[in-house]
Amino acid sequence: MKRELKPDFYYKYYIYASGVKSAVESFRFVLDAEIEEEKLHYAVGRLLQRLPWLSLKPYITKEGRLNAYADAVGKPVYRDDGSRCFLGSKDTQGYLFYVSFKEHEIWLRIGHSLSDGRGMMLICQLLLYYYLEARYGSIDDEGLLNAALKPD
């Protein structure tokens, strides 16, 4: 059952799926080693558990109102093939963000409606933390994150 969540303001989420220009932030991370897809899927799964608001997916009600529902089904992780993905569409399974990878690079693309710049930095930190933890084992988190934001 969908749990409806009304947006705090009338932000027009539909622009993400319509293909028009919108506020999408891109972050690129270059690592020394080849990216392991299953570890990246794990990291995004942990990210969705830790920050459940990332799973908000917009939809239009029968009455024409914009609402959102929380649905963490699937993970928006894709091998980068050069094609364009539209946030909030079937391309991203309805998510307003996605993660792509290619060789030694990870790209995080996130709609500005989900977070401001400070929140996006937290998302970046946690994504990298969970990926590196899955890839290399336990990581000493001292000095990585604010004490109030320690990983699970």
Give the location of each predicted region.
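Non-catalytic N-terminal regions of enzymes
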Residues: 1-152
